[in-house]
Amino acid sequence: LQLTDVFREAVAPYAALEDLYDMEPDAGLGNGGLGRLAACFMDSLASLDYPAMGYTIRYDYGLFKQKVVDGWQTEIPDNWLPGGEVWMVQRQDSAVTVRMGGKVDYIWRDGHMLPVYKDCDEIIAMPYEMIISGYGDGASVLRMWSAKSNRVFDMKSFSTGDYARVMQMQNEAELISKVLYPSDDHAEGKTLRLKQQYFLVSASLQNILADHMRRWKDIRRLPELAAIHINDTHPALCVPELMRLLMDEHGLGWDEAWDIVTKTMAYTNHTVMAEALEEWDQSRVKMLLPRVYDITLEIDKRHNQHLRSKYPGDENKIKTSAILYYNKVRMANLAIVGSHAVNGVSALHSDIIKNTIFHDFYLDTPEKFTNVTNGIAYRRWLCQSNPELSARIADLIGDKFVKHAEELDKLCKFAKDKSVLEKLGEIKLTKKKQFADYVYKKSGLVIDPSSRFDVQAKRIHEYKRQLL
């Protein structure tokens, strides 16, 4: 908004603006590669004046704060909401219900098969909104879902002293939005993660369709007026869930619903390691999401029929491309089958997925595959993070680069300009001194600003390769 200097002057009699920045916690919504990319999407879409809505879970506790004590990792809860929720507005009128568990029976009525849900757990998804400002006057909306129990408080049991059971019933639903990335090295953790994924997907799609119907009245125009981005496989249940909503709630037949789904969804893949592609036990999905599992079963059956028709006798195509295989639900395969566009995040990455892990998909539908190289929101990581450097760049090439990154190419002509390089070196040293002051304030360590800093802003984990 270009108001930093105005606010710095306004608060100067009372505090330094940087001290106020330090008081505001980072939103505990995911700060790894996926979270960073999603945040940059929101900034870019807002700056380019595209109408956009991002969806996430409103976690009570974000990714744990990590300390190393005597060589061992110590995890501390990231209680970010006190201080962080000041930017949020609750939208109680847009709350939706998400159903899990139970069983589904089917009845035929007027030539249509209708699901009948029995003994389901109903969870209220309560939305909160945060406005994401772009450069200038553009803005996007981030909608966050908080899980609330739909069960009526059992006053009778509470009055008879059965407090633990009453509170357990209330708390089970609310666990869904309690912690970002709960541990999944045990069965309960795996189930909770699957609940989180479906909770996010179902609540968000219900909201998207309700918004679409309020504005446009015709569900068949959805692909024309909306695009849904599956950012890695965590939201891949979008595919069967949108099918469920279109068929069960809007009365469409399978073929018409599938046409809408595949024209609306787009999937970004983030890993080239086959062993890292997300899978769920079929039994877990069937138990927790019986209707979604049945739809996934039908999607898989029809996709396999297509492959057998196109490649008769080549069962290896089924082995690599089936959604359900060896008692697993393969989420990347589900996302690819249900999307009209599939991209990697760099030219090399996109080539690898076409030639290795998704090669059979590429042979079948090469028109789906494309590349979208990941960038960064440099207004955040250059202009805001380093205003001195940003101001110097503006002196050299003008300020159009703030909205047009290609303008930065004009800096190449200064590559051997000694005076320019000296000035850039001075700015770099200033920032290193500021960082040294920060390290001293936070840890008591004194570091030499003239030394070389090799920094990896990642949590400590063996696959992050800090030992390199």
Residue ranges with predicted function:
Residues 1-468:
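A conserved ligand/cofactor-binding region detector
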